Each structure stands twice: as structure tokens, then as C-alpha cells.
Amino acid sequence: MLSSCGIALEDKPRNLSAELPDTLIEGAITTTEAPSILETVQIFLAKDSEEGSMFLETVEREIEPDGSVKPILEQILNGPTADEQERGLVSPFAEGSSLVGTTLEGSTLLVHLDTLDGFPTDDSASNQLAFAMLVCTSTELLTGIEIKQVLVLLERDDQTTAVNAPVSDGEPPADGEAVRCSNYITYMQD
């Protein structure tokens, strides 16, 4: 017994008069892009206190995670958003420094920069604050990883040089040694 679905057979194909969606037209190119998954992270930015001194304040940012801490630390170098600036948040960083990458050795995070051009150029409170933002974000706010200290390195001409980070508290580290958030207690709120 033969049965059919009720559509008559035709001897040859014919053109359809209905308008087809672009994706069904011959030769159409479709692109489907997976929606980006954002992750909320915290970083430290600087804020002026009522007494005129600066302190670190936690802010949240949305990033596209890549499995490393690099996109988080890049948010610090990017400085405050317009909304954050309206709330009084500032950054001592100027344009000029780029994060090359990060490496974890034990509990020490190695932060590789291409230059210090974006950092304040002296041993001032602004320079200390810049390092405090990087170091304390790394040791206090990054989740899922234990970082106790940070060593900032410069990558130039295929050479790596440790940066002597200026500190606000405690003994200055020996040349090329890592620093901890406890070296920047002055900038932490009670």
C-alpha cells in the first residue's frame, strides 16, 4: 500500500515566490558568534579622603575572562570609568604602560610590563599608590589563587629586569625583591 503526505509531485523544480530569510538564500553567509561570557571581578582604585590623603577603594568591573589574571590587572592600568570618576575615584597611572603578561611562581605573582612610562616617575605617594593598586589587587582581591607577594618586571630588548617597587610602609625591599600588600597599609581603609 502506498501513501503520501498530500503534496503533489512535480516533473521539474520551480521557483518559489515566497520571500526567504537571508540565511536560506543560496550563497548566504551566516555568522553566529557565541555571546561573550562576562565575569565580575574586583580591583583597587584610589580615592581622596576627606583629610586629603589617598586610600584604596574596591570597585567591581566586568571582564571577559581568559583564565589568567592579566585582564583583571589591565583594568587597573585602564583607570577609572567615567562613572567611577564621578564618584571621586582616580588613578595615578597615565597612558604608556602595557601589561605583557603574568606568571605565578609559588605564591609570588610576576607582573611583566613593557615600560614604566605610565607610572609616576618619582618615589612620591602617587608612585607608591600605583604599586599599591597592583600589589593589593593581586594579593587581596583575586579569588581562586593564593598570591602573597608581587614582583613587577620590565620586558625590554629581550631582557627582563626586576623593578624596585617604592613602598609606603615597612622596610624597603632589597633591589629586585617582591613586595606585599602590607608594604602599603597607609593606603588601606580601616
Residue ranges and their predicted role:
Residues 1-190:
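Bimodal "functional hotspot" detector
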